[in-house]
Design a protein with these regions (language model features):
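N-terminal capping/linker segments that flank leucine-rich repeat
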Residues: 2-3, 7-84
């Protein structure tokens, strides 16, 4: 999967967090070189602070992890669009 567009679905914050966590939990299974996630638009902002959480527990920490691979696990990093 290359692009996961889930914007403008009026998702609640917990739902946005769940989408981000699901991608984080399965990060090693995505083989496309430049995957994209869009959970912006009419959706709520993900919870938390955009930072390296070890382990991540909030939506923005999951986003940080999949965008940066701070533990250098070697998975393909994502481009993520979300509401702040």
């Amino acid at each position: 999967m290359r692009q996961y567009y889930y914007q403008d679905c009026a998702l609640l914050q917990g739902d946005v967090d769940a989408v981000c966590q699901s991608i984080y939990d399965n990060r090693a299974d995505f083989s496309y070189a430049t995957p994209e996630l869009n959970v912006g638009g009419t959706n709520a902002a993900p919870s938390g602070v955009y930072q390296d959480g070890d382990p991540p527990t909030t939506g923005k920490e999951y986003i940080y992890e999949i965008e940066n691979d701070p533990e250098t696990e070697g998975y393909n990093t994502w481009s993520v669009t979300y509401n702040v």
